[in-house]
């Protein structure tokens, strides 16, 4: 008995000594605190009364990180500082944060004391990693959630699931899969954004939720909003507000892969006007540029084929005279004979892997380099924007496409490090380049971008993400709904899909657009698209203009016309909601 008492006394003393040493290693800062424990330097800082940044680095190895996503500067927040049961307690007017300086664990609570989330004791690790010859780390951060707590976010994932509990995701942005290391818990009213752009892993198991990434630090933001709307307001406060888009962007868009000539595009618009069916925008897909013996050496040259588009300025003007807008596609990769490729290559601003189209030799530019973004815009502006006066951009393949892929491709250098370390932010930076340059040049047109990929924060660039090249099936239509919801719950409000699905060739053997089975799918997809932020008909392998499905008086034509007209009757509601999203972060 005496032995047990002595052992208990020794254990108690040891615990008290450990806590005392930890407390002595804790330093208060103006917005929070910092400490060193478990081989890590930890800094906890309030960015606002409801946003907390947690920043961890290996002990004695500080890293000055500049975020590509976070635009908010820390507010001056009154933080109360105290000790409670060996833990450091930080309080704002909204949140209470407990930091265990012995274990590195951090728990987040409402000011009333209700626990929201726990950054796990001993849950952060740094394992040495060679990143293309540069010393780095495999960083892992682990969190504890309630057993039955649902979470959402993570990105656009085509798996048909909404709740992201008990799932694992290899977070690498590709066609149809658009990830961001973020999740929200609307039931408890909080969200976490893990500020990392590398190819990463998301893992939620009964034991823990974890992010695992390549990097020099564990850097995340805890946001409390009370409910889903409140959370999204916090996300936009941190990563940028969504600008209000023009009224015309909420009308009907017609597109296909592709209109081969300026006359074909213009005639489609004229026919819609003759039928008195509302339409606001025509979209021009790829290969309007010169085609040299079909080799794609002029791929994405930001110029027009003189035979098929002999007078692009007149073409754009005619579209405008018909009271419609013009959106035109641009890609991040360049063919071998383009002036952009030559200039960027001479300056070491090409990422040397194969991108679309196959066997073309096209390569993507180093979007992480601000000078490369300047060069990209220089040609885009001269060849298209200031020349024909288009109204919007369709930025395709913004992941970007990666074909003939080799593992060594991810070691390729960019302006900000290895491609592997920043890959998932490619779309964010590409859209940044277009939006910021257009805004600097022109105050007359708001930036409007349709883009195939995305990352949290991209909402600030006037972007509308579409779900990529999805197949024309009922199963894929069903998957659009949870994919859209999880994507927009990251604070990115504008999302859409190709009405009818992009790849529709399977229906050609049975009549194509006249096939009753395809017509039913297309009409159902259009009904879904009517209530999406952008209503856009697009696809390949069979035409999608309304008259290809029949004529007025036939059910498929009439059903589409009914939905298009409904869209326009809803415009007062849609535009008012757009204002709420922009002005109130609704």
Label each PLM-derived region with a short phrase:
Residues 278-560:
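Aromatic- and carboxylate-enriched substrate-binding clefts and catalytic-loop regions
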Residues 44, 94, 182-183, 272, ...:
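Conserved structural-core and active-site-/substrate-pathway-adjacent residues in large, well-folded domains
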